[in-house]
From Swiss-Prot:
Record-given protein name: Translation initiation factor IF-2
Region listing for Disordered, in residue ranges: 44-195
Region (G5): 427-429
G4: annotated span: 391-394
Keywords of the record: Cytoplasm, GTP-binding, Initiation factor, Nucleotide-binding, Protein biosynthesis
Disulfide cysteine pairs (residue numbers): none
Biased composition (Low complexity): 82-93, 127-169
Limits of the tr-type G domain: 282-451
GO CC, one annotated term: cytosol
Compartments where found: Cytoplasm
Pfam families reported in the protein's UniProt record: EF-G_D2, GTP_EFTU, IF-2, IF2_N
Length: 781
């Protein structure tokens, strides 16, 4: 015999290749797969094994078949003999011949219901014929479920026989189902109850059931028995949760969930978080320079940095907060230049909270002033050490001892007099005593043991923020802990974004900054508020969600604050008499000036008149500001910003009053005077025209000539002018020359070109706007 493959053998014997392989393995013959060959010896063994298996499988099958049918050839032979013997007897009912068959049927399924044989119509045939007929009937019915009747039933009995067949099959299945259902399934053993569950705020019945390893229906029943009606998705309060858990004997612990959208709480938790002492490193001290106006704060910082910041300020007064970092003896010190006059009280108080050391600058020739006292109170409230810098000791009328004597009244006693306050006499103008002052700062910082963890996500505060036309929202941040990197997802106050670029105080781009370092960043979606906290999160999605949530909450709070008058309290306002109220909209170039001006206006106390600031923002005055002012009958105050041409036209149409200022004292005095007398000023500024700079020409001994195109109104020779760049006033002065072609001109109307030079100003650039104005005297009403 030739070799046979496994799959061929399986196909020939109508079995699967898998079974053939298993049979060969049982015989100890290893084959790889269905393509393997079987030799003759293995084939004989496999045939014997397969034949034996088939015989064993056929034996019970035949036995079952014989039991079910009851008409197999073996058992029917005696019946055939009996029927042949009994068939010779006359008038014997044919139905009696079925008794043995009926007995056999009872072993299987339910017997078929046989009608009595019709003996009257039965033909009296010979015994041989009956025997032959009986044998024929048995042979025909041996394989039928309803067989066994020697008298073949007629056509009327066939449906009945079919019914018996179907009933037999169904009854067998039902019996099998009953046998299976009689064995009840073993219920799963419930899990043990936990010792304690932890929840925050509330839980639904389904959530509580999951924590207790119980079915919700069981909890609903228990709650109902305890007097609480609840559904599976209903939230349970703390009392209901404690009630059901007490019934089960389970302890309950409520987890206090920290609202990450509350940056102040989140900031304090992160700042006070316990860290490994080995990760802490020494950080530079953050120093705030405070004092009375014109006592030399900016000059002191200017001397330290060898810069000329003071020259760029209007009237010699610092209008913006700046942050700078110096390096002395291989150690860094971060300075915050906090403006000193009373208008910046809020900014100074906020600055005191983010700094470590306060330098109180007091002029030796002026002594203690109101802002000096205010700065002392802020520093003491923040619990910061104070170093007194007695400035202007180079002046002949300087009297440092008088300053020291006056400060003792405020618990600032010099070390020379037995106190613990460091006094450092300096001359910021000539640089005298500065090195000693810096040494004192480093000494105090060593005593304070200022440390931070740079190996964490950065947190800190906003020093300043503004809207830049080219870069968008720009914020100056002070990193208080951690390290800030480019690309970090950040939430700053009610704004969010990703840090796109960072510039340090020297104007250089950096990729990361550590603790106590000021840095200017871009990439926020809006301008934050000065003094806002900032936190770096792990992903941008979280930062976006928190920022949007905070912005929406702030908007809702702002709307609710501006709509405090309702039907409930309207009558009370009416009984109080006619309420005089001045609505004010403040627009400034930077956020710090906005807050300072707003804080100053709120302090104005005029009997019968209240100040209500309905809107503050950074940037030029636009049409939306005019629309808001017209709807709320408000006055617009612009600080270092100008209205756009469209906004000015809208203001004239809506009769909206716009007051523009560059020095904050003048704005405060004007508003206070208007509130006291409710009178218009004696002089009113009138804008007569605007011109756009198209080209600039530098001429020696003349300066910069601006080639302009008059876009609105007219430019006159005797008018005052302002140079506006990106909506911000960069210079204010007078026209030196106004020419049309090469001839001098008294005025140039709209639509014409002209050449303009401005007195004492040559930094004119293309796309600047030259605004011409005159002061008109008007009558008091």
């Amino acid at each position: 015999m030739s070799k046979v493959r496994v799959y061929e053998y399986a196909k020939e014997h109508q079995v699967s290749s898998k079974k053939v392989i298993e049979a060969l393995k049982d015989l100890g013959i290893e084959v790889a797969n269905h393509m393997s060959t079987i030799n003759e010896n293995a084939l004989r063994q496999l045939d014997n094994a397969v034949d034996g298996t088939n015989k064993k499988a056929e034996a019970p099958k035949k036995e079952t078949t014989s039991n079910e049918n009851g008409n197999s050839k073996g058992p029917n032979k005696p019946n055939m003999t009996n029927s042949n013997e009994k068939s010779n007897k006359p008038n014997k009912p044919a139905g009696q011949a079925n008794k043995p068959a009926t007995a056999n049927k009872s072993q299987g399924a339910k017997p078929a219901t046989n009608k009595p044989a019709n003996t009257g119509n039965q033909t009296q045939a010979s015994g041989n014929q009956q025997a032959g007929g009986q044998k024929r009937n048995n042979n025909n019915n041996s394989n039928r479920p309803g067989g066994g009747n020697p008298n073949r039933p007629g056509g009327n009995n066939r449906p009945n026989r079919g019914g018996n067949f179907n009933n037999k099959g169904r009854n067998t299945k039902k019996k099998g189902k009953l046998n299976h259902s009689t064995v009840p399934p073993t219920p799963p053993k419930p899990k043990e109850l936990p010792e304690k569950i932890v929840f925050s705020e509330s839980l639904t019945v389904a959530e509580l059931a999951k924590k207790l390893y119980r079915e919700p229906s069981e909890l609903i029943k228990k709650l109902f028995m305890l007097g609480v009606v609840a559904t599976i998705n209903q939230s349970l309060d703390k009392d209901a949760i404690e009630l059901i858990c007490d019934d089960y004997g389970v302890q309950v612990e409520e987890e206090i969930k920290v609202d990450v959208t509350d940056l102040d709480v989140y900031f304090e938790n992160e700042l006070n978080e316990a860290v490994d002492e080995s990760k802490l490193v020494e950080r530079p001290p953050v120093v705030t320079i405070m004092g009375h106006v014109d006592h030399g704060k900016t000059t002191l910082l200017d001397s330290l940095r060898n810069t000329k910041v003071t020259l760029g300020e209007a009237g010699g007064i610092t209008q913006h907060i700046g942050a700078y970092q110096l390096e002395i003896h291989n150690k860094k010190i971060t300075f915050l230049d906090t403006p000193g006059h009373a208008a910046f009280t809020a900014m100074r108080a906020r600055g005191a909270q983010i700094t470590d050391i306060t330098i109180l600058v007091v002029a030796a020739d002026d002594g203690v002033m109101p802002q000096t006292i205010e700065a002392i109170n802020h520093a003491k409230a923040a619990g910061m050490p104070i170093i007194v810098a007695v400035n202007k000791i180079d002046k002949p009328q300087a009297n440092p001892d008088r300053v020291m004597q006056e400060l003792t009244e405020y618990e600032l006693v010099p070390e020379a007099w037995g106190g613990d306050t460091i006094f450092a006499p300096i001359s910021a103008k000539f640089g005298e005593g500065l090195e000693n002052l810096l040494d004192m700062i480093l000494l105090v910082s060593e005593v304070e043991e200022l440390k931070a963890n740079p190996d964490r996500r950065a947190i800190g505060s906003v020093i300043e923020a503004e809207l830049d036309k080219g870069r968008g929202p720009v914020a100056t941040l002070l990193v208080q802990d951690g390290t800030l990197n480019i690309g970090d997802p950040i939430v700053v106050g009610n704004t969010f974004g990703r840090v796109r670029a960072m510039v340090n105080d020297l104007g250089r781009r950096v990729k990361k900054v550590g603790p106590s370092t000021p840095v200017e960043i871009t990439g926020l979606n809006d301008v934050p508020q000065a003094g806002d906290r900032f936190v770096v999160f792990e992903d941008e999605k979280t930062a976006r969600n928190i920022g949007e949530t905070r912005a929406s909450r702030a908007l809702v709070a702002q709307r609710s604050a501006t709509n405090r008058v309702s039907l409930d309290n309207l009558f009370e306002h009416m009984k109080a008499g006619e309420m005089k109220e001045v609505n004010v909209i403040i627009k400034a170039d930077v956020q710090g000036s906005v807050e300072a001006l707003a804080a100053s206006l709120r302090k104005i106390d005029v009997e019968g008149v209240n100040v209500k600031i309905i809107h503050t923002a950074v940037g030029a005055i636009n049409e939306s500001d005019i629309t808001l002012a017209a709807a709320s009958n408000a006055i617009i105050i612009g600080f270092n910003v100008r209205p756009t041409t469209q906004a000015r036209e809208a203001a004239e149409n809506e009769s909206v009053d716009i007051r523009l200022h560059r020095v904050i004292y003048k704005a405060i005095d004007e508003i206070e005077a208007a509130m006291k007398g409710m009178l218009d000023p004696e002089f009113q500024e009138k804008i007569i025209g605007q011109a756009q700079v198209r080209q600039t020409i530098n001429v020696s001994k003349v300066g910069t000539i601006a080639g302009c195109y008059v876009t609105d109104g007219k430019i006159t020779r005797d008018s005052g002018v302002r140079i506006i760049r990106d909506g911000i006033v960069v210079f204010e002065g007078e026209i030196a020359t106004l020419k049309r072609f090469k001839d001098d001109a008294k005025e140039v109307a709209k639509g014409y070109e002209c050449g303009i030079t401005v007195q004492n100003f040559n930094d004119i650039k293309e796309d600047d706007v030259i605004e011409a104005y005159v002061m008109e005297e008007i009558e008091r009403k």
